[in-house]
Amino acid sequence: MADFEDRVSDEEKVRIAAKFITHAPPGEFNEVFNDVRLLLNNDNLLREGAAHAFAQYNMDQFTPVKIEGYEDQVLITEHGDLGNSRFLDPRNKISFKFDHLRKEASDPQPEEADGGLKSWRESCDSALRAYVKDHYSNGFCTVYAKTIDGQQTIIACIESHQFQPKNFWNGRWRSEWKFTITPPTAQVVGVLKIQVHYYEDGNVQLVSHKDVQDSVTVSNEAQTAKEFIKIIEHAENEYQTAISENYQTMSDTTFKALRRQLPVTRTKVDWNKILSYKIGKEMQNA
């Protein structure tokens, strides 16, 4: 073991550790981090070398965070990344510092970053909040307004999770939606992601995603936001229904096929006559 460790450079150790961390199941970052910490046995190397992995994990997972003094939680995403561990909360018009390891927000400061699209962002944010409240019992959303490659763009992010470690499962829903404000019609692009980990007497993960494309009529802010949410609702309902139907089909067919109906001999054992079988006699003589 010592010879192997001597052959592996610190850079390679950090790379392996970072990969474990970025692939941690939802709600299990701390468990994976603690395991990696024991394996690496070098806290300074882990914190300095794998810091980017902590940040990448939180942004990929749309980690929600509560900022002291503000009611709504905001999502940690690449779209809100301002650099130097600071992130944007467009709804509350602030930026804040985020500790990727402790998952805590601090130092809120005023920040205007809607790219001159305040009314568009607020209309979409208001409509999306109502949708998330109706459809996700533990859901959060953040809406950004940016100018990307010269195009005014709305980006909507949704996160909802259920962490049930006592029941040996954790799961998270994420979706991201974009459209450019280009009348009369704009393309809507979305990606939906589901990740669930079940680990009682086994280790099963569901990792699924779906890409969506649609179009929305761009008129005034309120009407466009309403049509935007209709597209989101239809696509997400359709995806969730398809996932449920697929699991029902798997339960009725695939999983049943995994269970052996008869022993290898293709003959059922008559337990009332077990003593007449050779194995029964051998057991009796044992």
UniProtKB/Swiss-Prot annotation:
Recorded GO MF terms: actin filament binding
Principal location: cytoplasm
Entry-linked Gene3D superfamilies: F-actin capping protein, alpha subunit, F-actin capping protein, beta subunit
Modified residues (N-acetylalanine): 2
Modified residues (N6-acetyllysine): 19, 97
GO terms of biological process kind: actin cytoskeleton organization; barbed-end actin filament capping; cell junction assembly
Disulfide partners: none
Record-listed Phosphoserine modification sites: 9
Keywords, alphabetical: Acetylation, Actin capping, Actin-binding, Cytoplasm, Cytoskeleton, Phosphoprotein
InterPro entries assigned: CapZ_alpha, CapZ_alpha/beta, CapZ_alpha/beta_2, CapZ_alpha_1, F-actin_cap_asu_CS
Any GO CC annotation of this UniProt entry: WASH complex
Subcellular location as annotated: Cytoplasm, Cytoskeleton
Keyword Phosphoprotein in record: yes
Function of the molecule: F-actin-capping proteins bind in a Ca(2+)-independent manner to the fast growing ends of actin filaments (barbed end) thereby blocking the exchange of subunits at these ends. Unlike other capping proteins (such as gelsolin and severin), these proteins do not sever actin filaments. May play a role in the formation of epithelial cell junctions. Forms, with CAPZB, the barbed end of the fast growing ends of actin filaments in the dynactin complex and stabilizes dynactin structure.
Family that this chain belongs to: Belongs to the F-actin-capping protein alpha subunit family.
Assembly and binders: Component of the F-actin capping complex, composed of a heterodimer of an alpha and a beta subunit. Subunit of dynactin, a multiprotein complex part of a tripartite complex with dynein and a adapter, such as BICDL1, BICD2 or HOOK3. The dynactin complex is built around ACTR1A/ACTB filament and consists of an actin-related filament composed of a shoulder domain, a pointed end and a barbed end. Its length is defined by its flexible shoulder domain. The soulder is composed of 2 DCTN1 subunits, 4 DCTN2 and 2 DCTN3.
Protein known as: F-actin-capping protein subunit alpha-1
UniProt source species: Bos taurus
Lineage, highest ranks first: Eukaryota, Metazoa, Chordata, Craniata, Vertebrata
